[in-house]
């Protein structure tokens, strides 16, 4: 893999500007500004694709950032060509959701919680003038996932410090920082502070995940040739299986966090919710009460 990576350096260099170009900050129009960080060009879409679509439908500004370029996330491809392919996939997925997409040019599998990367994340949060920041918890099987969580945690206070990254104006108010759910139990399990019904947008989320073909239809880093059918009927069945898997995942979250859904929607409405996403408040950001959470997730009167 090192030899392959070296042979593709010129291609990576050619793609650097494309991979790192930042979208302009949203206008000051009174709408919410949400930025989500994932380790790879599929993580944000899996974790918050439903809520992102709900926010976007109301005109709020949502940005999904992949902290690495995903350039080793396939069993058959790697380097610059894969990075550019995954960037294009993420952009298509995020277009379906109605949100802004950005893929940073850091090698997949090589993310570290350095000062340079802390500054990078801090600048991105400030430039978006975020009200809400979402990231994985720093307890995970994948080092890129862990360090994405650490980097966002480490930015939670620094975004308000004027002379840290003084080239970008600091935020006057610390955003609300939220964690995505996971199933890891040690040192402590995920504890939801809010759960959101995504029934109205579940098909849109599945359509967005459809666009990430290298990961979900070709198997990503753990795929193999037999996983990719050539017969049209089998291809259609493969797509059906992948969509059904993600649909089941959203159903499992609704079942797992049914009591939290009831807190926000009431028992009767919660019992009828089929699909959900959930979030835990990070203690290092602003600590919203229930009323502020309802303003940040303005979906409960629907």
Predicted regions and their residues:
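N-terminal secretory signal peptides that target proteins for export/translocation
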Residues: 1-4
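Bacterial N-terminal signal peptides
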Residues: 7-20
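C-terminal accessory domains and tails appended to enzymatic cores
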Residues: 27-28, 163-166, 171-173, 184-188, ...
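Flexible, active-site-proximal loop/turn residues at the rims of small-molecule/cofactor binding pockets
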Residues: 50, 139, 183, 285
């Amino acid at each position: 893999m090192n030899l392959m990576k070296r042979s593709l350096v010129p291609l990576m260099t050619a793609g650097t500007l494309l991979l790192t170009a930042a979208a302009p900050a949203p206008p000051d129009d009174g709408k919410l500004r949400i930025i989500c960080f994932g380790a790879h060009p599929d993580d944000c879409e899996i974790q918050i694709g439903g809520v992102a679509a709900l926010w976007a439908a109301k005109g709020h500004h949502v940005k999904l950032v992949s902290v690495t370029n995903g350039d080793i996330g396939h069993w058959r491809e790697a380097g610059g060509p894969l990075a550019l392919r995954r960037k294009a996939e993420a952009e298509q997925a995020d277009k379906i959701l109605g949100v802004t997409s950005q893929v940073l040019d850091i090698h997949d599998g090589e993310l570290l919680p350095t000062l340079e990367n802390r500054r990078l994340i801090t600048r991105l949060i400030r430039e978006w003038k975020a009200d809400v920041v979402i990231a994985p918890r720093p307890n995970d099987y994948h080092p890129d996932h862990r360090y994405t969580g650490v980097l966002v945690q480490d930015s939670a206070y620094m975004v308000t410090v004027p002379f840290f990254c003084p080239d970008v104006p600091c935020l006057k108010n610390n955003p609300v920082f939220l964690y995505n759910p996971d199933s890891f139990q040690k040192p402590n399990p995920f504890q939801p502070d809010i759960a959101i019904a995504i029934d109205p947008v579940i098909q849109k989320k599945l359509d967005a995940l459809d666009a990430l073909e290298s990961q979900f239809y070709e198997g990503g880093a753990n795929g193999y040739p037999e996983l990719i059918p050539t017969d049209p009927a089998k291809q259609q069945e493969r797509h059906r299986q992948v969509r059904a898997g993600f649909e089941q995942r959203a159903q499992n979250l609704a079942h797992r966090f049914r009591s939290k859904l009831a807190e926000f929607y009431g028992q009767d409405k919660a019992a009828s919710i089929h699909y959900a996403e959930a979030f835990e408040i990070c203690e290092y950001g602003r600590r919203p009460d229930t009323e502020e959470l309802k303003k940040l997730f303005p979906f409960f009167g629907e």
